[in-house]
Amino acid sequence: MIMKFVEKYFEFEKYGTNLKVETLAGITTFMTMAYIIFVNPQILSTAGMDFGAVMVATCIASAIATLVMGLYARYPFALAPGMGLNAYFTYGVCLGMGIDWRVALGAVFISGVLFIILTLTKIRTWIFNVIPNAIKYGTAVGIGLFIAFIGLKSAGIIVSSKATLVTLGNLMEPSTLLALFGIFLTSILVSRNVIGAILIGIIVTSLIGMILGISPFPEGIFSMPPSIAPTFLQLDIMGALNLGLLTIVLAFFFVDMFDTLGTLSALASQAGYLDKDGKLPRVEKALMADATGTVVGSLLGTSTVTTYIESASGIALGGRTGFVSVVVAMLFLLSLFFYPVVKAIPPYATAAALVIVGALMMRSVKYIDFDDYTEAIPAFITLLTIPLTFSIATGLALGFITYPILKVFTGRWKEVHWLVYVLAVIFALRFVYLSG
C-alpha cells in the first residue's frame, strides 16, 4: 500500500525508474556531499560558534531543505550549507569585519526572507537574467579561489609573511604533509570519478593522522546528538538591519541566487527535465526549497543553504524523482548520531575538501568572454578581489561598479540593464559609507 503510494506520488513509471535505483541514487548523492558535515562545523566554529550545535544545525537544515525539494518540488536535488558562503560568513564577515556571528546569522535570515519574497513574486528569475554573465561567473571563480586559499592556509601550506603578505609554509610539518597527501589523494579520486571522493579523502587522511599519532582517535562512533541550544534562535535580526550590513545581505542573496539557478539549470539539463523552451517546470518550487533552507538554517545556526551540484552523481546513476532527495534527507538525519567521528576529524584532513571544491568551481572561467574587455575586466576584478580581500561583498561591489563604467565609456551603455546601474550606485555608496 505504502509502496504503491510512493511509486504514484513520485511518478516512478513516468520516469522509468524504481525504488532500488532511486535509493542507490540517494545514497550516492549523499556520499558525494557528506563532507559538508565535517567541513561546515570546522569553518563556522572558527567564528566562535559551538562546533556540536553547528553540526546538528547543518544536518537538520540540510535534511529539511532537501525534504522540501523532494516532497514539494519532487526533484532529485540535495541541499546543504554552501561552500564559499560559509567561508565568507566566518572569514569575511565575522573575523574580517569583526561582526558577531549572531548578527551574521541575522543577515543570512534576511537574505533568505528576501529570497522567499522574490521567489513568490517570480522576480528572482528576472533579476538573475539581467545580471551580467561576467559578474555571475567571475563571482563563482572568485569564491573557488577564496575557499581554496583558506584550505591551503588551514593546512599550513600557505602562511603569512611580513615581507610578501603570504609565503610557502613548512612542508615538513607532519600535519602539512598529511594535508598535501589528502589533496593529492582526493585529486586522484576525483579525477577517476570515484563516488564520494572528497569524503573518502577526508576519512583516509584522518585515519593516517590518527595512526601516526598526529591527532587523537574518536572517543567513540555513535552518540546522541549534541545540544543545538548554543546556536538555536540566536540570530540577531535587528543588528543585521544596520545600513552598513546591506551589502553583506546582498552578497549572501546574490551568491545564493547565482549558485542555485546555475546549479538547477545544469542538473535539470543532465536529467532531461527542461521543456522545449529550455525552462525547468516547477522551478519556483525548487527555488522555494532553497529559500526555505536558508531561513531555517539561520534559525538553527548555520550559514546559507543552497542546492548542491553533487546531486549530479545520483542523477548519473539513474535517479530521476524526489525520492532521491528523501533518501538524502534521511541520511543527513542519521548522521546526527555520528558526532564523535565528526568531532575527531582534524583541520588538515578537511583542507583537501576546500582546495578540491575550489578547483571544481574554477570551471566557470570558461564562460567568461575574454575577447570582450568590457566583459573580461569586470569578471577579472571580481574573481581577483574576492580572495585578496577575503570578501565576496567587496568583489561583487567592485565588479558591479566596473561593469557599467566600462560599458558607458565604450559607448555601449544600452547593453547594461537599469538594475545594474542601480546596484552599482548602491555598492559605490557602500564604500563611501565605510570610508566615512
UniProtKB/Swiss-Prot annotation:
One Pfam family it belongs to: Xan_ur_permease
Residue spans crossing the bilayer: 24-44, 51-71, 79-99, 103-123, 139-159, 171-191, 194-214, 235-255, 322-342, 345-365, 381-401, 416-436
A GO molecular-function descriptor: purine nucleobase transmembrane transporter activity
Sorted UniProt keywords: Cell membrane, Membrane, Transmembrane, Transmembrane helix, Transport
Gene Ontology CC entries for this record: plasma membrane
InterPro entries noted in UniProt: Azg-like (IPR045018), Azg-like_bact_archaea (IPR026033), NCS2 (IPR006043)
Membrane topology: Multi-pass membrane protein
Subcellular location: Cell membrane
Family classification: Belongs to the nucleobase:cation symporter-2 (NCS2) (TC 2.A.40) family. Azg-like subfamily.
Protein name per the record: Putative permease MJ0326
Phylogenetic placement of the source organism: Archaea, Methanobacteriati, Methanobacteriota, Methanomada group, Methanococci
